[in-house]
Regions:
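Catalytic Walker B motif of ABC-type/P-loop ATPase nucleotide-binding domains
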Residues: 74-77
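Conserved ABC ATPase signature
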Residues: 49-53, 57-59
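Hydrophobic anchor residue at the start of the ABC signature
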Residues: 63
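Short coil-to-helix segment of the ABC ATPase nucleotide-binding domain corresponding to the Q-loop/switch region
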Residues: 9-16
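Helix N-cap at the start of a conserved alpha-helix in ABC-type nucleotide-binding domains
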Residues: 85-87
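ABC nucleotide-binding domain "signature" region
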Residues: 28-40
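A short, proline-enriched helix->beta-strand linker immediately N-terminal to the Walker B motif
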Residues: 68-72
Length: 140
């Protein structure tokens, strides 16, 4: 998987990119980047380059970059693809934490078993039709 990280730049720079584009003040950038990296468990990798990280760590850098500017909506397309089950659950727990802090999280995935463990509303797309998860329908 390609996480669209800038290979010649540090993890700090990769996560800071949206804030730099927005014109955020340098001191605020440092605070927010460190906060985002701390949330994804990579604060100790701030000076590393993407090529030195595992695929799962690169995935989490991408997530940190996506949430560093506190978006109201986070779209995640196959965020757990090619990750082991434990790391997949860690990432879903991160999304749950973001949601608990006011970010709407929309996840597209083929891993229905993983999603079924989450307590939030899920929809299924099958044969071009959207339907509510059967388990959710049973509880309504």
């Amino acid at each position: 998987q390609n996480h669209r990280l800038l290979e010649r730049h540090t993890i700090f720079d990769n996560v800071a990119l949206p804030l730099i584009i927005e014109g955020t003040h340098h001191k605020q950038i440092e605070k927010r980047v460190h906060g985002a990296l701390d949330k994804v468990g990579l604060l100790d990798k701030v000076k590393c380059h993407p090529s030195t990280l595992s695929g799962g760590e690169q995935q989490r850098v991408g997530i940190a970059r996506a949430i560093v500017n506190s978006p109201p909506l986070l779209l995640a397309d196959e965020p757990t693809g090619n990750l082991d089950p434990e790391l997949s659950m860690d990432i879903l727990r991160l999304f749950e934490e973001f949601n608990n802090h006011g970010t709407t999280v929309l996840i597209a995935t083929h891993d229905l078993g993983l999603i079924s463990r989450m307590k939030y509303r899920s929809l299924t797309l099958k044969d071009g039709r959207m339907s509510q998860d059967p388990l959710a329908e049973a509880t309504l």
